[in-house]
């Protein structure tokens, strides 16, 4: 089957790039191909962090566990331990594998938005309720907590940023979380949309920077843009595009704040779910949207080594072949993507394709 066979090139990519890695002053960001979902492994010289643990189906579920297993086989110095696991929001495509990761590997710290609802509520509740007994430090964070007292610098602490590598220490900051009260201008529907309560995390490694916003949608995006527009809080070289490249998660005002050099989209193959009855698929959602690609195209200055022709959507179940020239990557096109970042702000991108 196609989904199973993709495990082989992903692992070959992992092993080939591993040959050049050691205890050096570099970080690696693994955008793991989990189909219509998201999971990103941050690898540092002295530790590892996982942001989200989604998977589209059982084959991708097993694939994520296999990928992490091979990672820890290579990084024996980490003793099968994730210094931190972050779940941006309680949807199953972002935490499907959370329970099995907790059973298979050691997790030192776990953070989320504190919600106990949504399609991924079982796994989120499990982690929240079992953390203390498993000796996992757990915290949840809200937008109000982060911005209290007019704070526009985000928040960080030893839970959010547990990595302390000699001469290669990242700075990890949280800029948004769940909204405790309905913001002005939000409808009740906006407030009940758990995507809008996604954690927003920025990782700065010397002169390199990465931004992760979960599935934050238009109202949530506008709230953080309004909050931080007078700062460089959201400015980042590498943007993980929100909500799998949906039309409602990337705006002009937002990209003006981020000014990305590279964009990465995590989504499934365009025809995943075509002909089936399951509506929670790439085909039914129509990810990524062509208008999102076009908007990114306006802001990203550099080009991929080679342009690619790939499928993107005008709407649900309406895909078309487009040419992608700019530094826009997607797990649907490139499968697992690994970005090597240096303290001096140099990036090297490796993909399965």
Question: What is each model feature region?
Answer:
Residues 109, 115-180, 185-186, 191-193, ...:
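Binuclear metal-ion centers of metallo-dependent hydrolases, dominated by the metallo-beta-lactamase
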Residues 20-26, 306, 310:
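Sec-dependent signal peptide cleavage junction
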Residues 97-101, 125-126, 223-227, 250-258:
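A short acidic, amphipathic alpha-helical/loop segment
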Residues 36-38, 57-58, 90-96, 116-120, ...:
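Active-site environment of divalent metal-dependent phosphoester hydrolases
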Residues 10-19:
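Hydrophobic h-region of N-terminal signal peptides that target proteins for export
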Residues 2-10:
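Sec-dependent signal peptide recognition
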Residues 45-49, 58-112, 116, 229-246, ...:
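Active-site metal-binding motif and surrounding structural segment of the metallo-beta-lactamase
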Residues 22-80, 143-235, 332-353:
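Core dinuclear metal-dependent hydrolase active-site scaffold
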């Amino acid at each position: 089957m196609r989904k199973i066979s993709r495990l082989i090139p992903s692992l070959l990519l992992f092993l080939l790039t591993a040959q050049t890695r050691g205890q050096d002053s570099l970080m690696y960001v693994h955008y793991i191909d989990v189909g219509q979902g998201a999971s990103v492994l941050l690898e540092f010289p002295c530790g590892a962090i996982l942001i989200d643990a989604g998977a589209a189906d059982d084959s991708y579920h097993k694939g994520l566990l296999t990928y992490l297993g091979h990672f820890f086989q290579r990084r024996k110095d980490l003793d099968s331990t994730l210094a931190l696991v972050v779940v941006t929001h309680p949807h199953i495509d972002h935490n499907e594998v959370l329970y099995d990761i907790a059973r298979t590997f050691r997790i030192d710290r776990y953070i989320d938005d504190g919600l106990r609802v949504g399609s991924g509520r079982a796994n989120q509740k499990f982690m929240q309720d079992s953390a203390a007994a498993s000796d996992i430090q757990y915290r949840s964070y809200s937008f109000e907590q982060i911005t209290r007292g007019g704070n526009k610098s985000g928040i960080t602490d030893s839970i959010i940023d547990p990595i302390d590598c000699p001469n290669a220490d990242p700075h990890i900051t949280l800029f948004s979380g769940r909204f405790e009260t309905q913001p002005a201008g939000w409808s009740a529907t906006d407030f009940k949309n758990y995507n809008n309560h996604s954690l927003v995390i920025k990782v700065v490694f010397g002169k390199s920077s990465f931004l992760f916003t979960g599935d934050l949608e238009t109202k949530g995006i506008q709230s953080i843009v309004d909050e931080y527009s007078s700062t460089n809080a959201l400015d980042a070289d590498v943007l993980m595009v929100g909500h799998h490249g949906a039309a409602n998660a990337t705006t002009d005002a937002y990209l003006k704040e981020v000014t990305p050099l590279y964009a990465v989209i995590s989504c499934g193959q365009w025809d995943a779910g075509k002909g089936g009855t399951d509506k929670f698929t790439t085909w039914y959602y129509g990810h990524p949207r062509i208008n999102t690609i076009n908007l990114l195209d306006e802001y990203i200055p550099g080009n991929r080594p080679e342009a690619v022709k790939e499928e993107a959507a005008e709407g649900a179940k309406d895909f078309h072949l487009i040419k992608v020239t700019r530094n826009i990557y997607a797990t649907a096109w490139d499968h697992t993507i690994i970005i090597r970042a240096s303290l001096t702000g140099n990036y090297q991108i490796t993909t399965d394709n």
